[in-house]
Amino acid sequence: MAEEYELNEIDDTLHGSVGSRLSLFARELKSRRSSSWHGGTALRLPKDLYESLVIHPNGRWYRIWANMMFLWSIYSTFFTPFEFSFFRGLPDQLLDLECVQLVFLADVAVHFFLAYRDPHTYRMVHDKRHIALRYIKGSFALDVLGCFPWDAIYKVTGRVEAVRWLVWVRLYRGRKVMAFFKRVEKDIRVSYLLTRIVKLITVELYCTHTAACGFYYLATTLPPAREGGTWIGSLSLGDARYINFREVDLLTRYVTSLYLAIVTMATVGYGDIHAVNTREMAFTVVYISFSIVLSAYLIGNMTALIVKGSRTERFRDRMTDLIRYMNRNRLGSAIRSQVKDHLMLQYESSYTRDRVIVDDIPVAVRSKMSQTLYLDMVSRVGLFRGCSDDFLSQIVLKLHEEFFLPGEVILEQGTVVDQIYIVAHGCLEEVANGEDGSEEIISELRPYGIVGDVAVICNIPQPYTVRVCELCSLLRIDKQSLTSILQIYFKDNSQILSNLLKGKETESKRKQLESDITYLLAKQESELVLGVNNAAYHGDIFRLKSLISAGADPSKSDYDGRTALHIAALRGYENIVRFLIQRGANVNSIDRFGNSPLLQAVKSGHDRITSLLVEHGAILNLEDAGGYLCRVVRGGRIDLLKKLLRFGISPNCRNYDQRTPLHIAAAEGLHLVASTLIESGADIQAKDRWGNTPLDEGRRCSSKPLVRILEQARTVATN
């Protein structure tokens, strides 16, 4: 595609002399003898096309032919108005010039075999039927009409004036001249300033040349008796008079007409040559009006050359810098070709410039634009199916559109990937590369497909190489942007992991991903629980609400079995406890240490939270009530003991030695604790594994008040 401006090697002195530029052209011509048909990119044609007679547009011989046709197009474009105005039928000595039309007829035949690049897919089309249909629907009719011998037809039809006008169809060949200048403007080997100046001079000369022919045509189409009333018939310059101007030599007549056209375009005043009759005046009015527009065009282009602000010049500067960089680092031809093709695609599509413009728009407005452009497409991507609208809105805001040419590799197998691509237009293919260098096409990706998702989400190397089949428009989102969004929308994170597993049709793919996704789900769940518990620990109810609204489960426990309700009850945050209960948190969950939320509230002395939990069905739920109550008694925590007894713990529960809390209180001499236990119904006659009663323990302790309390309790129990 970009062979016109590509160089295999280029000196850094690009702004040198004309001689150095010619030497560059010579070296380039030699280096292209065998580079047109071979190569692995999708922009090149198969090697067997010689047999099918399809011509490559970048082939050496066709380029020579195209340059030759460019020269003949210049001749035809300039000679056509000259022939129309100065000859009413070509004289015999110029009839041989009509043979040139055979060259253009041959060019018509060549176009039936000339491969072309599809503007939508960027693939080279080499099917002769498609080539012929495209050419017939395009410029075929005008090209063929231009090849007709209109001079001979004019003479055969009795010199009908309308037939002469048909010769103007040959001006359609001027498109070859415009295409040449457009191509040279992008050729970094040629001075951009010189190219633009030559182009502008050519435009100016052609306009004045055509106007000169028009002025002369107006004079020759009047009857001979009225030719004295024309601009040239009435002309008198010094001793020369043009009364019989047809007898004046051809060169003098043309130069005189050209002088009139240039003076009129320059609008230097009403000179010695001027319009005489009404037709000439009307033509002059139209011509001067056109010259004003042309002058503005010329001045505008010269101004753009001075300020160096044109898009083409920026492209040339960037291409020059890239080629210097690639030459300095001796990059391979495949990489060079891919870089140049991609830069050319950017230039033709101008999408990078548009993206810069969008970046300057406020985020709120850009968000609405992104939703309008991409939301429908993203919602139809399998990976994001079932995700919330808020999540999708954040995704589309981070998307960037990129274009890729056929043959380009988007992702390589085994590499670390940090972006995900959504196919907006075009076609990709996933290819598995074997150890022996073989390739196996795994799948073909069309619009709404996605690549890089497995590698990015599962944090694994890219499993397959992803290659462009036809010109693609891809929507890219960076891994960092996606990760930051997923950290906020936890529920959508789980949905994406589920979609990722469902989206892999084959059993082998599913088995490969199951372990990774299971690990990610467990990791995500543990991180989410830690986030919820951390918010509960610090009393941050707003953060807690956002986490639960995003999909966090308030009943999930951390590595110690603690839930957010455990922590809130321990820390005394009544508003958080109330919120968690409203969100369905389990009020009777037990951590690995045997603590329930109610027990945590009781131990911490948060009476209001205790009442709130009991009101919603919470119980102490002690697995080893006897052992725990005995430890409370041994610690002398009488207030906690009273609360535990009030919430249903039996005073006669036993520890592993069958000792009751009253045994412990008697052994430790805690008469106040013993009184509390007796008042709560403790059995004074209970025996431990050694047959000892609380009274026996009290007597060994030698605490007279305690013994007296125990004996009174025994007497009461006996009676």
Swiss-Prot record:
SUPFAM superfamilies: Ankyrin repeat, cAMP-binding domain-like, Voltage-gated potassium channels. GO terms for molecular function: voltage-gated potassium channel activity. This is Potassium channel KOR2. One of its GO terms (cellular component) is monoatomic ion channel complex. It is found in: Membrane. The segment S4 is probably the voltage-sensor and is characterized by a series of positively charged amino acids. The pore-forming region H5 is enclosed by the transmembrane segments S5 and S6 in the Shaker-type (1P/6TM) and contains the GYGD signature motif which seems to be involved in potassium selectivity. Keywords: ANK repeat, Ion channel, Ion transport, Membrane, Potassium, Potassium channel, Potassium transport, Repeat, Transmembrane, Transmembrane helix, Transport, Voltage-gated channel. ANK repeats lie at residues 523-556, 560-589, 593-622, 624-653, 657-686. Residues 1-63, 115-137, 186-199, 307-719 are cytoplasmic. PROSITE patterns: ANK_REP_REGION, ANK_REPEAT, CNMP_BINDING_3. The chain crosses the membrane at residues 64-84, 94-114, 138-158, 165-185, 200-220, 286-306. InterPro entries: Ankyrin_rpt, Ankyrin_rpt-contain_sf, cNMP-bd_dom, cNMP-bd_dom_sf, Ion_trans_dom, K_chnl_volt-dep_EAG/ELK/ERG, KAT/AKT, RmlC-like_jellyroll.
